[in-house]
Amino acid sequence: MKVTFLGHAVVLIEGKKNIIIDPFISGNPVCPVKLEDLPKIDYILVTHGHGDHLGDAVEIAKKNDATVISNYEICHYLGKKGVKTHAMHIGGSYLFDFGRVKMTPAVHGSGILDGDSMIYGGNPAGFLITLERKKIYHAGDTGLTREMELLGEENVDVAFLPIGGNFVMDVEDAVRATAMIKPKKVVPMHYGTWELIFADVELFKKKVTEMSVECVILEPGESLEL
């Protein structure tokens, strides 16, 4: 299974089914690919409704006849645009044909900007994905939360955690989150896309390495094999 970081919070998982998380491709200043470069996508996971995460979900879904997995409110919004959806909510899990997805708590917003209006986008979330005997945790956008301690019981293989501060955890809090989650590997994300969310990724790596957690810094377009 190949897991590719495409910048910001975009993660592409290529295996028996191809899954993309938070598909902010167009307009993403650090994404190295264009929409036409993506492989066939079977599922799209959206953590919350902000434009830098909902991104190109509609276009990708329609082009590939892909199913969007997100909260009920986002799925309702996308369903009206002709997109196939599977609605879930925090704490819920479902066994798909590629594996199991569980929605986990996130502390953030989820409003959907539609023209001049802000539409209620439900509650933000993270995803715990179990597939091909591996567990991947994508935190979405979130601050530090005590619920992360429960993930420490899940034997997570790789955790994607935001570290950019301002809107999400900063380096210090992401280190604390890593200590609670106890993943085998951690990949920092949601930093450096814009100056506002600059973070010292090497400091993050140093601190989590001291906790005996492997930190994998992926530049946009780089992959790891699970």
From Swiss-Prot:
Source organism's superkingdom? Bacteria
Q: Name one GO molecular function term.
A: hydrolase activity
* Keyword Ribonucleoprotein part of the UniProt annotation: no
Q: Which Pfam families does the record match to this protein? A: Lactamase_B_2
Which keywords does the record carry? Hydrolase
Q: Which InterPro entries match?
A: Metallo-B-lactamas, RibonucZ/Hydroxyglut_hydro, UPF0173, UPF0173_UPF0282_UlaG_hydrolase
Residues in a coiled coil are none
SUPFAM superfamilies from the entry? Metallo-hydrolase/oxidoreductase
Stored SMART domains: Lactamase_B (SM00849)
Q: Which family does it belong to?
A: Belongs to the UPF0173 family.
Full protein name: UPF0173 metal-dependent hydrolase Tpet_1587
Q: Which organism is it from?
A: Thermotoga petrophila (strain ATCC BAA-488 / DSM 13995 / JCM 10881 / RKU-1)
